[in-house]
């Protein structure tokens, strides 16, 4: 699949993150959604010592769109899946994201 065809989900997290379980829950949920929608998936680490984990949708060279932010605490993979599904569904109505509009049914089936 070409990188820019349908877009990709990006998980941004600090490389200094101490709670690997949080990162795993968020990244597994994002990877699962990416696979179900035929999107690319990537985990991006950065050097700042911050605890939030972010998930973005990126289409081609356009600015990434934030979908999810985990600021700490308990992370339930099902809650992350639901949040990603809801945000992707909302984005599917934006005229800029026609590829998501065509995937709306798959987005709503994701859980």
Predicted regions and their residues:
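Short, intrinsically disordered low-complexity segments
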Residues: 39, 43-63
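Cysteine/selenocysteine-centered motifs that mediate thiol-based redox chemistry or coordinate metal-sulfur cofactors
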Residues: 1-9, 94-111
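Generic detector of low-complexity/intrinsically disordered segments
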Residues: 4, 39-41, 69, 86
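Hydrophobic beta-strand residues in large extracellular and virion-surface proteins
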Residues: 9-11, 30, 41, 53-57, ...
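Intrinsically disordered, low-complexity segments enriched in small/polar residues
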Residues: 2-5, 45, 58, 70-71
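Auxiliary Fe-S-binding modules of radical SAM enzymes
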Residues: 28, 44-46, 108-110
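Non-catalytic, surface beta->alpha helical segment in thiol-disulfide oxidoreductase systems
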Residues: 58-104
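Local sequence-structure signature of Cys/Sec-based thiol-disulfide redox active-site neighborhoods
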Residues: 1-37
């Amino acid at each position: 699949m070409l990188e820019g065809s349908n877009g990709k989900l990006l998980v941004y997290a600090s490389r200094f993150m101490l709670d690997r379980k949080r990162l795993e829950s968020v990244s597994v949920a994002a990877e699962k959604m990416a696979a179900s929608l035929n999107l690319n998936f990537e985990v991006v680490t950065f050097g700042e010592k911050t605890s939030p984990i972010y998930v973005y949708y990126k289409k081609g060279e356009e600015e990434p769109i934030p979908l999810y932010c985990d600021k700490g605490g308990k992370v339930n993979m099902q809650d992350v899946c639901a949040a990603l599904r809801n945000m992707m569904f909302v984005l599917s109505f934006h005229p800029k994201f026609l590829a998501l509009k065509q995937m709306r049914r798959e987005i709503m089936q994701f859980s």
